[in-house]
Amino acid sequence: DMDLYWADGTTTQTETTPVMLTNAGRSKKKAIVSFVDDDCRSEAYTVLFPLVQELGMPYTVACPAGLMGKTGRMTVEQLQEMARSGVTVACHTMTETDMEQDTPETLEATLQQFEAEMRRWGIRGVRSYAYVNGRYKADCLNTVKKYFDLGLTVEKGINQIPYESCRMKRVEVFPKNKSYTLEDVKAWVDKAVQDGGWLILMTHAWYTTFDAAQLKELVGYIRASGAELMDLYDALDATGNVVEAGDYQKPGADAAEPFFVV
């Protein structure tokens, strides 16, 4: 359970109380951690799913709908089983196409196809798009916003309100090139606990670097840290108190001035 800490030091916890990362400085900043596994390879079902169940933890899988049932991929039935158990689903296009190859029109066609498959499979509530290879283009982001609440990049960082909803940062666990270690990922958790914010961790269960024992260790570390382990969409619903207007990106002196509606 998560309490809000108000200026007078009291806490409140009701069903209608929003859990806010920041509330004009009045509430204690809260650290939230969510996990997303990309690609829906067979290992997401055979290796990751049993761990998710054993640890009783929330997880999201990013699904390339057109590749399900192909060699090395999960089957539709496996995805449905995971969804029934509480695992949530993100879009990873139909066939893992890189957005750099897209126009707004081709992307729209792909996302319509993806939506149709999800409906056909009875999978609801797909509210995010994990960009293939982490790539995205400014001229396609309005199309993303039309279909999804979140666009997930591979840029490292902790997400702070107001969220750049089409450019959500993620930190990879077990990178293929072993460029950093589990201790480095723990340091990101520490930073989230210290500063508040939403840390989205990315895994690829099919990478040879994926380590089940280390994932267990990391989940234990997160739980002991005081950070809240939350499903991607639960975290968004709990903290998404700011509605974006226009296309928001922090860097760039010549960018249009962003504004937000609270």
Model-derived regions, located:
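Short active-site segment of divalent metal-dependent hydrolases/proteases
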Residues: 41-42, 95
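Alpha-helical elements of Rossmann-like donor-binding domains used by nucleotide-donor carbohydrate transfer enzymes
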Residues: 47, 113, 139, 143, ...
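C-terminal domain-boundary segment and adjacent tail
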Residues: 5-27, 54, 59-63, 67-69, ...
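Metal-dependent polysaccharide deacetylase catalytic core of the NodB/CE4 family, i.e.
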Residues: 31-33, 53-150, 154-173, 196-205, ...
